Regions:
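Acidic, glycine-rich flexible loop/linker segments
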Residues: 2-150
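Conserved alpha/beta-domain cores
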Residues: 113-430
């Protein structure tokens, strides 16, 4: 990296990279730094050395796909992108958000995180145990998670397991797909989320349905009575029931809003699964997280979907670029909500895991640790970096940090407490 970067963006995935700026998502190579928008991500062909994402939607489904690649990434605004031109030699640092131009200097190697054994115990500097699980969508990603030292697979996005020919998946398909994933993850325990559809992750076999997958529309268990989803769910359960005899499996019911919903779908799943399979609820709305004590009375565990929860808290579609600045990962009110959830869970907080991008955002994980959370399901490439963060910080420091954040009034105050440069983070109310 040049000594004086011309731009400061928001760090998104760690690592340093250098290459020629390429402003199209196709024909990318390791000699390129790709300058693209979130809408371009689905059209990517080839893998660049690094990404610059313009007008990013950090919590969107498209950006989660990008994170799974494990490639250095920095987020910038449209005004910053005007200083960059196709073919320009660029270096980026995904840890600091620095972007610079220097044709003669290749990117330095970023410090490598410590390698850990699959399932190895992870503690803070003062001995508090933390579990870093992986959110995956394929057998390959499950294998990557095991190699990265994950404590387990905390979330299998089963909606991405779909026949390539566009036909409706059946029990045989899921039997093969789940077995491949479970074998790749071995010896780690695996939590499979039943089919969870969203507007931009609709399988080819599903006919058009109004409001399907929209933030305030039909998603998760709300679709489980619809054809052909009802049969697909049954086939997923059939496959999991057979595999549970030889693999450590948990089941997660998506987008549970009310206790009655949980009890209904939990009973349905329990009829199909052996008693060894624990069944959890995914809480992704204010109604769900504010009812955590009752959900924990019925569910074996609860996974809080932070991406959709933030969408609900800030009333902003996480996939919509024009609303991206409202989804503020440093807003003090967000952490006060997580403090309230933790307090209501009490000693049962150990049965809650946090899923999504939030814990991966720079500076946020120590705050969540300070609020009492110990289980996180994150994108597999992040695990070594987050593990190093955990090992290098004491719980007492995390608790002090969380207390300060929860008394802050503005995002700017949060950034100052976290000692983060506001230049490198979006102006959340621009």
């Amino acid at each position: 990296m040049p000594s004086e970067p011309i731009l400061h963006g928001m760090p998104y995935f760690p690592g340093r990279a250098a290459g020629r700026l390429h402003t199209r998502p196709d024909s990318l190579t390791g000699q390129h730094i790709a300058l693209i928008t979130p809408g371009d991500i689905r059209h990517i062909t080839g893998l660049p050395a690094g990404f610059l994402i313009v007008e990013p939607t950090p919590f969107s489904h498209a950006m989660i796909t990008l994170l799974g690649l494990g490639i250095p990434t920095v987020l910038i605004e449209a005004g910053q992108a005007q200083a960059l031109q196709t073919g320009m030699p660029v270096g980026i640092d995904g840890m600091t958000g620095e972007i610079g131009i220097n044709a003669g200097i290749p990117a330095r190697h970023a410090p490598s995180p410590q390698q850990r054994r699959p399932g190895a115990r992870l503690n803070t500097a003062d001995g508090t145990r933390v579990r870093l699980l992986a959110s995956v969508r394929s057998a390959a990603a499950a294998g990557q998670a095991a190699a990265a030292g994950a404590s387990g697979i905390g979330l299998v996005r089963s909606e991405f397991l779909s026949p390539q020919d566009g036909t409706i998946p059946d029990a045989d398909f899921y039997r093969r797909s789940f077995r491949d994933l479970l074998d790749a993850a071995a010896p780690l325990p695996v939590t499979v989320r039943l089919l969870d559809l969203a507007a931009d992750k609709l399988p080819a076999w599903l006919p058009p349905t109004p409001r399907l997958g929209e933030p305030l529309g039909l998603q998760g268990v709300r679709l489980y009575h619809a054809h052909p989803i009802q049969q697909v769910i049954q086939d997923q359960l059939t496959a999991l029931a057979e595999l549970a005899d030889t693999h450590a499996i948990r089941l997660l019911l998506p987008f549970i809003v009310r206790l009655e919903e949980l009890q209904c779908w939990q009973a349905m799943a329990r009829r199909r699964l052996p008693d060894s399979v624990r069944i959890g609820a995914m809480a992704e709305t204010l109604a769900a997280v504010l009812d955590i004590p009752h959900l924990l009375d019925s569910a074996d565990f609860v996974a809080i979907g932070c991406n959709d929860l933030m969408q609900a808290v800030f009333s902003a579609d996480r996939d919509e670029p024009v609303l991206r600045h409202y989804l503020d990962p440093y807003a003090p009110v967000l952490f006060r909500l997580f403090r309230q959830i933790a307090a209501s869970a009490g000693e049962r907080l150990e049965r809650i895991q946090l899923c999504g991008v939030l814990a991966q955002i720079q500076g946020v994980l120590p705050v969540l640790l300070g609020l009492g959370y110990r289980n996180f399901s994150v994108d597999a490439p992040f695990i070594p970096y987050l593990a190093d963060t955990i090992a290098g910080i004491s719980l007492s420091d995390c608790e002090a940090l969380a207390a300060d954040i929860c008394t802050a009034r503005t995002t700017q105050q949060s950034l100052e407490i976290l000692q983060l440069d506001s230049q490198r983070h979006p102006p959340y109310l621009a």
